Amino acid sequence: MKYTEIKEKSLQELEGLLKEKKLELFGLRMKLKTMQLQDTSAIRKTRKDIARIKTAIAEKRRAG
């Protein structure tokens, strides 16, 4: 997910998206531990998406 897409969303949408991504990351980690995960780079991509979302949330809160 690109930062420009994330930046356009409202604060509530971002918080919902953050929750979804955290659940997705949890699921990916479980798949990794049970040897079911084929694309191990998905964990890194999801972590980066979470960081982008957190950055956008902080930016919106600072702006008011």
Swiss-Prot record:
Q: Could you tell me which Gene3D superfamilies the record lists for this protein?
A: 1.10.287.310
Q: Which domain of life is it from?
A: Bacteria
- A GO-annotated cellular component: cytosolic large ribosomal subunit
Q: Does the keyword Ribonucleoprotein apply?
A: yes
GO BP annotations, alphabetical order: translation
Give the UniProt keywords, A-Z. Ribonucleoprotein, Ribosomal protein
The cysteines covalently paired via disulfide bonds are: none
Q: Which Pfam families does the protein's record reference?
A: Ribosomal_L29
The answer to whether UniProt assigns keyword Ribonucleoprotein to this entry is yes
Q: What's an example of a GO molecular-function annotation for this chain?
A: structural constituent of ribosome
InterPro entries linked: Ribosomal_protein_uL29, Ribosomal_uL29, Ribosomal_uL29_sf
Family statement drawn from the similarity comment of this UniProt entry:
Belongs to the universal ribosomal protein uL29 family.
Q: Know the name of this protein?
A: Large ribosomal subunit protein uL29
Organism, scientific name: Nitratiruptor sp. (strain SB155-2)
